[in-house]
Amino acid sequence: MDSASGTFVTEPTTTLNALFSAPGATATSWDDARNTLEAAELFWIATVRSDGRPHMTPLVAVWLDDALHFCTGESEQKAVNLRHNHSVILMTGCNQWDGGMDLVVEGQAVRVTDQHTLEKLAEAWTHKWDGSWDFEPGPDGFKGNGNETVLVFTLRPDKVFAFAKGPFSHTRHSF
Protein backbone atom coordinates (compact mmCIF):
# COMPACT_ATOMS: atom_id res chain seq x y z
CA MET A 1 0.00 0.00 0.00
CA ASP A 2 1.20 3.47 -0.82
CA SER A 3 1.30 5.19 2.57
CA ALA A 4 0.98 8.67 1.06
CA SER A 5 -2.21 8.02 -0.92
CA GLY A 6 -3.67 5.04 0.96
CA THR A 7 -4.11 3.12 -2.31
CA PHE A 8 -2.89 -0.35 -3.19
CA VAL A 9 0.14 -0.51 -5.44
CA THR A 10 -0.31 -3.04 -8.24
CA GLU A 11 3.04 -2.60 -10.01
CA PRO A 12 5.91 -3.27 -7.63
CA THR A 13 9.44 -2.00 -7.44
CA THR A 14 11.58 -4.93 -8.56
CA THR A 15 15.16 -5.58 -7.41
CA LEU A 16 17.59 -8.43 -7.94
CA ASN A 17 19.69 -9.56 -4.98
CA ALA A 18 23.01 -10.27 -6.70
CA LEU A 19 24.45 -11.84 -3.54
CA PHE A 20 22.05 -14.79 -3.87
CA SER A 21 21.84 -14.90 -7.68
CA ALA A 22 23.99 -16.56 -10.32
CA PRO A 23 26.46 -14.31 -12.15
CA GLY A 24 24.64 -12.58 -14.99
CA ALA A 25 21.18 -13.55 -13.70
CA THR A 26 18.30 -11.19 -14.34
CA ALA A 27 15.42 -10.32 -12.04
CA THR A 28 12.22 -12.31 -12.44
CA SER A 29 9.70 -9.94 -13.99
CA TRP A 30 6.53 -9.15 -12.09
CA ASP A 31 4.53 -10.51 -15.06
CA ASP A 32 6.28 -13.90 -14.73
CA ALA A 33 5.80 -13.96 -10.96
CA ARG A 34 2.13 -12.95 -11.22
CA ASN A 35 1.48 -15.57 -13.93
CA THR A 36 2.99 -18.22 -11.65
CA LEU A 37 0.73 -17.09 -8.79
CA GLU A 38 -2.31 -17.23 -11.08
CA ALA A 39 -1.50 -20.76 -12.29
CA ALA A 40 -0.46 -22.28 -8.95
CA GLU A 41 -2.82 -24.97 -7.68
CA LEU A 42 -1.33 -25.42 -4.22
CA PHE A 43 0.16 -23.02 -1.68
CA TRP A 44 1.63 -23.32 1.81
CA ILE A 45 0.44 -20.83 4.42
CA ALA A 46 2.52 -19.76 7.42
CA THR A 47 0.80 -18.06 10.36
CA VAL A 48 1.85 -17.36 13.95
CA ARG A 49 0.25 -18.87 17.05
CA SER A 50 -0.55 -16.62 20.03
CA ASP A 51 2.52 -17.97 21.86
CA GLY A 52 4.78 -17.03 18.93
CA ARG A 53 5.26 -20.51 17.47
CA PRO A 54 4.85 -20.80 13.69
CA HIS A 55 2.18 -22.88 11.99
CA MET A 56 2.34 -24.02 8.37
CA THR A 57 -0.09 -26.05 6.28
CA PRO A 58 -0.98 -26.53 2.59
CA LEU A 59 -4.09 -24.95 1.09
CA VAL A 60 -5.59 -23.79 -2.18
CA ALA A 61 -5.68 -20.11 -3.07
CA VAL A 62 -6.65 -17.98 -6.04
CA TRP A 63 -5.04 -14.86 -7.49
CA LEU A 64 -7.74 -12.34 -8.42
CA ASP A 65 -7.80 -8.54 -8.59
CA ASP A 66 -4.10 -8.16 -7.67
CA ALA A 67 -4.33 -10.25 -4.50
CA LEU A 68 -4.22 -13.83 -3.23
CA HIS A 69 -7.37 -15.17 -1.59
CA PHE A 70 -7.67 -18.23 0.64
CA CYS A 71 -10.21 -19.79 2.95
CA THR A 72 -10.27 -21.86 6.13
CA GLY A 73 -12.71 -23.31 8.61
CA GLU A 74 -13.45 -21.18 11.68
CA SER A 75 -11.92 -23.72 14.05
CA GLU A 76 -8.78 -24.53 12.04
CA GLN A 77 -5.43 -23.50 13.53
CA LYS A 78 -4.71 -20.91 10.84
CA ALA A 79 -8.05 -19.19 11.54
CA VAL A 80 -7.32 -19.21 15.28
CA ASN A 81 -3.89 -17.69 14.57
CA LEU A 82 -5.29 -15.00 12.26
CA ARG A 83 -7.65 -13.77 14.98
CA HIS A 84 -4.69 -12.29 16.89
CA ASN A 85 -2.02 -11.82 14.19
CA HIS A 86 -2.88 -10.94 10.59
CA SER A 87 0.69 -11.37 9.32
CA VAL A 88 0.87 -14.24 6.87
CA ILE A 89 3.08 -15.81 4.23
CA LEU A 90 1.75 -17.80 1.29
CA MET A 91 4.30 -19.84 -0.66
CA THR A 92 4.13 -21.84 -3.87
CA GLY A 93 6.66 -23.49 -6.13
CA CYS A 94 8.28 -26.83 -6.66
CA ASN A 95 10.74 -29.04 -4.82
CA GLN A 96 13.25 -29.25 -7.67
CA TRP A 97 16.74 -27.88 -7.15
CA ASP A 98 17.55 -26.72 -10.68
CA GLY A 99 14.26 -25.82 -12.32
CA GLY A 100 11.08 -23.85 -11.80
CA MET A 101 10.39 -20.97 -9.49
CA ASP A 102 9.45 -20.62 -5.83
CA LEU A 103 7.42 -17.63 -4.67
CA VAL A 104 6.97 -16.24 -1.16
CA VAL A 105 4.17 -13.68 -0.68
CA GLU A 106 4.18 -11.60 2.53
CA GLY A 107 1.40 -9.38 3.81
CA GLN A 108 -1.62 -8.96 6.06
CA ALA A 109 -4.66 -11.25 5.79
CA VAL A 110 -7.97 -9.37 5.76
CA ARG A 111 -11.37 -11.07 6.16
CA VAL A 112 -13.71 -10.91 3.18
CA THR A 113 -17.43 -10.52 3.94
CA ASP A 114 -18.57 -8.36 1.01
CA GLN A 115 -21.16 -10.39 -0.94
CA HIS A 116 -20.07 -9.21 -4.39
CA THR A 117 -16.45 -10.14 -3.66
CA LEU A 118 -17.46 -13.51 -2.18
CA GLU A 119 -19.49 -14.28 -5.32
CA LYS A 120 -16.50 -13.47 -7.57
CA LEU A 121 -14.20 -15.59 -5.40
CA ALA A 122 -16.59 -18.56 -5.28
CA GLU A 123 -16.73 -18.49 -9.07
CA ALA A 124 -12.93 -18.27 -9.28
CA TRP A 125 -12.50 -21.31 -6.99
CA THR A 126 -15.02 -23.33 -9.02
CA HIS A 127 -13.37 -22.57 -12.37
CA LYS A 128 -9.79 -23.03 -11.23
CA TRP A 129 -10.24 -26.59 -9.99
CA ASP A 130 -13.01 -27.83 -12.33
CA GLY A 131 -15.61 -27.77 -9.56
CA SER A 132 -13.55 -29.60 -6.93
CA TRP A 133 -13.85 -26.52 -4.70
CA ASP A 134 -17.45 -25.44 -5.14
CA PHE A 135 -18.38 -22.75 -2.64
CA GLU A 136 -21.57 -20.79 -2.12
CA PRO A 137 -21.31 -17.31 -0.60
CA GLY A 138 -22.82 -16.92 2.86
CA PRO A 139 -23.30 -13.89 5.12
CA ASP A 140 -19.78 -14.05 6.64
CA GLY A 141 -17.79 -16.08 4.11
CA PHE A 142 -18.48 -19.27 2.19
CA LYS A 143 -21.06 -21.82 3.32
CA GLY A 144 -19.28 -24.96 4.47
CA ASN A 145 -20.46 -28.49 5.16
CA GLY A 146 -23.04 -28.47 7.90
CA ASN A 147 -23.41 -25.11 9.60
CA GLU A 148 -19.78 -24.03 9.76
CA THR A 149 -18.82 -20.84 7.97
CA VAL A 150 -15.72 -21.03 5.83
CA LEU A 151 -13.75 -17.84 6.48
CA VAL A 152 -12.36 -16.11 3.40
CA PHE A 153 -9.27 -13.89 3.49
CA THR A 154 -7.48 -11.58 1.07
CA LEU A 155 -3.72 -11.15 1.09
CA ARG A 156 -2.54 -8.06 -0.79
CA PRO A 157 1.20 -8.46 -1.12
CA ASP A 158 3.59 -6.20 0.74
CA LYS A 159 6.49 -8.17 -0.75
CA VAL A 160 6.84 -11.06 -3.16
CA PHE A 161 10.13 -12.93 -3.33
CA ALA A 162 10.78 -14.92 -6.52
CA PHE A 163 13.46 -17.60 -6.36
CA ALA A 164 14.15 -18.71 -9.94
CA LYS A 165 16.22 -21.83 -10.51
CA GLY A 166 18.37 -22.63 -13.51
CA PRO A 167 19.91 -20.01 -13.53
CA PHE A 168 19.39 -19.03 -9.92
CA SER A 169 18.07 -15.58 -9.13
CA HIS A 170 16.62 -13.94 -6.03
CA THR A 171 14.15 -11.18 -6.89
CA ARG A 172 12.20 -8.93 -4.55
CA HIS A 173 8.98 -7.24 -5.65
CA SER A 174 8.03 -4.49 -3.16
CA PHE A 175 4.56 -2.93 -3.14
Question: Could you describe each region identified by the protein language model?
Answer:
Residues 16-44:
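Short, basic/aromatic recognition patches
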Residues 76-78, 97, 169-170:
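Short, surface-exposed beta-strand-loop junctions and turns on beta-sheet-rich folds
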Residues 30, 75-76:
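Structural motif corresponding to alpha-helix initiation and N-cap regions
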Residues 51-53, 96-98, 143-147:
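A short beta-turn/loop motif at secondary-structure boundaries
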Residues 40-74, 80-82, 88-93, 101-105:
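Short beta-strand segments
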Residues 34-35, 60, 80, 143-145:
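Short secondary-structure boundary/capping segments
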Residues 1-27, 101-175:
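Charged, gly/pro-rich active-site loop segments
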Residues 37-38, 83-84, 126:
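Alpha-helix boundary recognition
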